[in-house]
């Protein structure tokens, strides 16, 4: 295999980490994949951490110890999350959403992947430290949000 350049390593690291949120990948895994030294991969992870922090793309965390490595946690910056939730609240306050019996029409919102994904990431962010084993929902309309939260956890 030819020598793998840094930009190629960064692309693959980003893809693998973001495809499996909250999964800890050992540096040895990436060393074997790229044929690179741990020190080189540590530098790559540092670069990605800086970029993710600068652009609010989530958090890359290094985990120390025998089972350590690096993991990606999707996080929406607080300011962006508050703006999103404010906009969602405004939408939900529309009188046209009120159904007979005092119910609220949500089907259109809960079928929009970009909205449900953000909702799931925001909810998951509140539970990262608790390390939950599963996510439950009480009603079928909550399944998309629970699925997105579970994916982030």
For each feature predicted by the language model, list its residue ranges.
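PRPP-associated nucleotide enzymes
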Residues: 2-9, 14, 21-46, 50-153
């Amino acid at each position: 295999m030819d020598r793998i350049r840094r930009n190629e390593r960064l692309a693959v690291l980003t893809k693998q980490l973001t495809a499996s949120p909250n999964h800890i990948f050992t540096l040895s895994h990436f060393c074997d994949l790229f044929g690179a030294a741990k020190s080189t991969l540590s530098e790559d992870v540092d670069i990605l951490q800086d970029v993710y922090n600068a652009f609010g793309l989530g958090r890359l965390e290094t985990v120390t110890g025998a089972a350590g490595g690096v993991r990606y946690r999707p996080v929406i910056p607080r300011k962006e999350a508050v703006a999103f939730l404010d906009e969602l609240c405004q939408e939900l306050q529309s009188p046209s959403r009120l159904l007979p019996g005092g119910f609220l029409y949500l089907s259109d919102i809960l079928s929009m992947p970009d909205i449900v994904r953000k909702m799931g990431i925001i909810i998951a962010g509140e539970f990262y430290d608790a390390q939950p084993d599963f996510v439950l929902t009480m009603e079928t309309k909550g399944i998309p949000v629970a699925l997105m939260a579970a994916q982030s956890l």
